[in-house]
Amino acid sequence: LCHMADQKGIPRYTGFLSDREQALALAAMNRAQCRFGEFRGGWPGAERRVLCLEPPDSWSEDPVAVLRLRAMAAAGDKTPGHRDYLGSILALGLDRACLGDLLQDPDNPAVTYAFVLQDKTDFIASHLTDAGHCQVRAEFCDAVPDSVLRGPERTLREATVPSLRADSVLAAMMHTSRTLAADAIRAGRVEINHV
């Protein structure tokens, strides 16, 4: 992809990549001595990001767009969460690579911002009608409020563990047994350095 972008002088973009896929793409870029690639996710703290290969002297475009998803929940009803929106968008027949981060507005739980590939915005906006048990309206968004872009709060935890084995550390962080932690690792629900 890097060589094709360089030879033809036109930009190339991947879909949204997970942390592991980004690490692999970066290693491949380094092996290919590609010096004009960068990752963009639509906001500075993005976890899922698009690899943008834009050779010098080529045009540049932003492959990431933002949709505001507004749940039309009745008073007292549960608003859709991350899993509900993710499931509803993927149920439209789209691949996970078309969808980046989903950020819920902390000031208004009925609103979630979805970072999506630019060429999928019209499709999602016109076909996404519900998520969870609520009707949803998707609309284009130019600016995401700063309160949303702060991202989730992360907490630092300290623990004393008998050994630095992954199951031991995970058990201490999850406040569970090493057996349950080992089961989570075997099931592939836990990654260490994207592996």
Regions inferred by a protein language model and the residue ranges of each:
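A basic, amphipathic helix-loop patch mediating RNA/tRNA/ribosome contacts
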Residues: 157-195
